[in-house]
Amino acid sequence: MLVAAGQFAVTSVWEKNAEICASLMAQAAENDASLFALPEALLARDDHDADLSVKSAQLLEGEFLGLYGEKVNVT
């Protein structure tokens, strides 16, 4: 099994983050990766806002993950 990892500088604009993630995911798929991991959620923290990760979470049926399916043809 080929595993790919992607990393990028996370912004506060989820749409931009989603576009970058989709691009990285497409690159992994083009190289026949079976699993693609993004560690960014582990880094999404703010010392002044302990709930940032929870507040930033996206629904599985939402636009953020829906964008991946559109860009990479994954459902």
Swiss-Prot record:
Protein origin, superkingdom: Bacteria
Function: Pseudogene resulting from a nucleotide deletion that introduces a premature stop codon at position 66. This is the N-terminal fragment. The intact protein (AC A0A140NCB4) hydrolyzes deaminated glutathione (dGSH, 2-oxoglutaramate) to alpha-ketoglutarate (alpha-KG) and cysteinylglycine, has less activity against alpha-ketoglutaramate (a-KGM) and no activity on glutathione or L-glutamine. May function as a metabolite repair enzyme.
Family: Belongs to the carbon-nitrogen hydrolase superfamily. NIT1/NIT2 family.
Protein name: Putative protein YbeH
